[in-house]
């Protein structure tokens, strides 16, 4: 296939310009501009040709109007909202669900953990599938899976089986796993690296995390207020909202986003090793608090999961031709530090989320709707945090914002660990939630921007997968760890507050370690920038 582009050069310091038509024989190649030449880039492939001109924001051929771009941004924000609402709409009615299925108290953790477990385990491959087969296609697949299994989750009431409900929620999580990473991949393709608009869009997407948490919990609580037996409509309503999002995505997402122009292939061996290892490892940590660590199958599964995960990393580093994890990431210590800090921060928040709702329902005896309504703080301060990120990330840099986010996660967990049961909501509780908003809304855009800008264009879906894998998987895994601590401290089950606080102390420890890592990364980043600045001044 032959492609034509214009090369723009200056002639001997004059303002005159020469337009040269240059024919380039290219197949799945990108013409990259040089230091001295301003080149209009053409991406050519056997399937489609994309032209990227000098627009400071994105390729203007993606959107026919500003209104359509706004709809695209709204679709991206809804994806994040659904991701968080998918967790809290069930969390705030967990006592209703437990009573409906006659579940034991210990099984409540599984009613909540199966969704983020599946989402976190499958997100890792969903971005790569989007990079290979089309980001929009995989996004649509994710929406369809969520719609189908949301309906089945509601119908599970008639099975009278909590195991069936837990399985349905897991498949619902698989669908969610295909939504957000591919949305983030589309943002990475549509908007230019480092552009202000890209930072704005990612910040707005991040703002929908606390907003989604509030709407999910509030509407879940509202539906069961009059009649708890109507809880299936919580999931039917979620399916309807997902269907409307599907229609928006179908219409607003451009069809001309390049697909696999670099000829990537799927690493099925690495994918299988990763998924099996992640699921088994997570299962062990969530099942052990229920049955006890002395059960032989728990120890056996733990050993098997570790073997699979070690095999995955060995295979990816030495044998995979096209590794699932880009080597540009696995060999970059700073990217690993970022992902580890995000893991620890969101892991502590996963513990906070479950035990905060348990605290309100079981100790303060709030109704499900009031428990969900307390998340309104997240909407207000989450929006403030999003605007702060959007307009400060260029000045402060994502490294500093990531550090602030870990401090917010840590402060929120510390405040929860000393929160009195009888104290008014408007004191420590209100302040705690306001601070936690900055943990969520600073960490997501900061880490997403660092990885999106740091990885090649062909890995944009994978960049979205990495951040969201860490966020979702850490929430489920660390909840299991928190459950282990809780049951060790409150073995009799008669001292809920003592057990809850013990789990939250673990969250404090995780977030504190995240602060240490993020501060280390920030200082190294500042030192490298200072050193480069000195090198430039010496060269000048």
From Swiss-Prot:
Keywords: Membrane, Transmembrane, Transmembrane helix, Transport
Organism: Saccharomyces cerevisiae (strain ATCC 204508 / S288c) (Baker's yeast)
Transmembrane segments: 62-82, 109-129, 132-152, 170-190, 204-224, 233-253, 273-293, 296-316, 335-355, 373-393, 399-419, 430-450, 462-482, 503-523
GO molecular function annotation: borate efflux transmembrane transporter activity
Superkingdom as given in the UniProt entry: Eukaryota
Protein name: Uncharacterized transporter YMR279C
Pfam families per the UniProt record, alphabetical: MFS_1 (PF07690)
Cell location: Membrane
GO annotation, cellular component aspect: cell periphery; membrane
